[in-house]
Amino acid sequence: MDLSVVVVTYQSRDHILACLRSLDAGIHAHDPAGAPLAWECVVMDNDSRDGTTEVVEREAPWARVIRTGGNLGYAKAVNRGIAATRGVLVLVLNPDCVWHPGAIHALAAWMRSHERCGIAAPRILNPDGSVEYSARAYPDSFTFLFNRYSLLSRLWPGNPWSRRYLLLDWDHASPRSVDWVSGAAMLARRGAIDAVGPMDEAFFMFNEDVDWCRRMNEAGWSVDYVPEAAVVHHIGASKGVVSNRVILERHRGMIHYFRKHHRRSAPLDRLAAFLIMARARMLVLLNRTGR
């Protein structure tokens, strides 16, 4: 088996079919390299209640639906999907991604020609065609203050921390190795997964991709951005309205990441955790007030 696709769904009925149809069309399209892919697809459903699984089973019967029995989080669902498949390459995918023609074959060709590439990722576009800055530098202590969505980044868009983190001094139009890429769409080599281990299930959602890519890089596998392959990401469509749990889990993931990769003195760890969760509580409060 050349390729296994693992799609994790949660309340994804409105977008999953566009994702799967673009996937199916892209894989069955003619590959200029003349190398057809033997492939399989599993949809790991995290207890959707909106008819996601029924739509997939009716409209895309070639995809195997696995019901996880609860909302396990992204990392745990991905790991179960990887364990249930056998492809040499594993495409981890959000259900709100729609592939451009030729993109999947371009990623597979990159992996064939770069034997030490552990993860290859496409250029991810927003629905309006602009680039989603999905290839980034490792986060540091200032990242949670100056990340893509923070108020400080909006007030000071050209700040040096955002430029470093989002790699804004690079045009994102040429291939290169990077620190990490978004888990919304990433093609991983099973041999690399076997070497470094699966995603860390201590991350419920968010930051598991940063950690996985970091472990790949540290083990000598490259993480490569391949802009020839492109996908449109209808970001947030698989999450629905942002819940307080999503906000809290994102910030808990930040704390786990920093404790795992940036351990300092206990007082500094506690201070960093306090500041991160204070930000989370502020966002929860704003979420409740509808702001």
Per-range role (PLM):
Residues 211-291:
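Active-site-adjacent helix/loop segment of glycosyltransferases
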Residues 90:
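Short aromatic/hydrophobic "clamp" motif used to bind/position activated sugar donors
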Residues 68-85:
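Glycine-rich, basic loop-to-helix element that forms the pyrophosphate-binding segment
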Residues 22, 45-54, 70, 100:
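A conserved acidic beta->alpha catalytic loop
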Residues 98-134:
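Conserved donor NDP-sugar-binding/catalytic core segment of glycosyltransferases
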Residues 12-31:
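Short, well-formed alpha-helical segments that are part of the catalytic scaffolds
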Residues 139-178:
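Short, flexible, basic/aromatic active-site loop/helix in glycosyltransferases
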Residues 171-230:
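A short, conserved alpha-helix in the catalytic core of glycosyltransferases
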